[in-house]
C-alpha cells in the first residue's frame, strides 16, 4: 500500500502444468492431467481388463509391471485411471491416486545423468510433491506407443527415435 492508500501490484504470469500424482508401491509418478478422462473405483471399473466408459474402450495398461515395481492393487485405495492422448486409450490401475496438482514449470526438473537410454523415453522429468520425488511419465510410453518403435523396421525406427524428444517434450 502506498502513502495515499492505493495498492501497487503487478500481475505476474506464471506458467504451470497440471499433473495427476499416483502411487505404485513406494514409487510416485505423475501423468499429465490433460489426458485424464476419469478415475474409477474398483466397483466402477469392474473385473474386466478393458474398461468401457462413454462408448470408448480403454485397454488395460500394467504400469507397475512396465516400471518393474511391486504394487498391491487389492487395497481399498486402488483406482483405475482412464487415460488418453487423443489416439490411444488406456485403463491404468494404480495403488493410490495421491493428488491433482498444478506445478510451476520452473519446479519441473530434468532427469539426472543417471537416467540413460530407454529411461529418457519413459520419463520426461521429475518434481517434488510434499517431499516425495515424483517421476513425470511420458504418456506415449505409458500407452505403449513407443513400444511400436521396437517393432518398426530399421529405417522407420531411426525416424521414430529422431522424433522421440519432441514427443517427450520439456520436463513439464
Residue ranges and their predicted role:
Residues 1-172:
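An acidic, low-aromatic, low-complexity terminal/linker signal
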Amino acid at each position: 500500500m502506498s502513502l495515499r492508500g492505493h495498492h501497487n501490484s503487478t500481475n505476474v504470469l506464471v506458467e504451470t502444468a497440471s499433473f495427476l500424482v499416483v502411487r505404485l508401491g513406494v514409487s510416485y509418478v505423475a501423468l499429465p492431467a490433460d489426458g485424464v478422462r476419469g478415475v474409477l473405483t474398483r466397483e466402477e471399473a469392474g473385473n474386466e481388463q478393458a474398461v468401457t466408459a462413454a462408448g470408448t474402450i480403454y485397454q488395460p495398461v500394467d504400469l507397475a509391471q512396465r516400471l518393474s515395481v511391486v504394487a498391491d492393487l487389492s487395497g481399498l485405495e486402488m483406482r483405475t485411471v482412464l487415460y488418453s492422448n487423443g489416439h490411444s486409450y488406456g485403463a491404468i490401475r494404480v495403488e493410490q491416486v495421491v493428488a491433482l496438482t498444478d506445478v510451476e514449470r520452473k519446479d519441473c526438473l530434468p532427469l539426472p545423468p543417471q537416467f540413460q537410454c530407454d529411461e529418457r523415453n519413459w520419463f520426461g522429468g521429475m518434481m517434488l510433491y510434499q517431499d516425495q520425488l515424483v517421476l513425470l511419465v511420458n504418456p506415449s510410453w505409458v500407452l505403449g506407443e513407443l513400444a511400436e518403435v521396437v517393432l518398426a523396421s530399421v529405417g522407420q525406427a531411426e525416424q521414430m527415435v529422431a522424433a522421440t524428444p519432441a514427443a517427450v517434450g520439456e520436463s513439464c
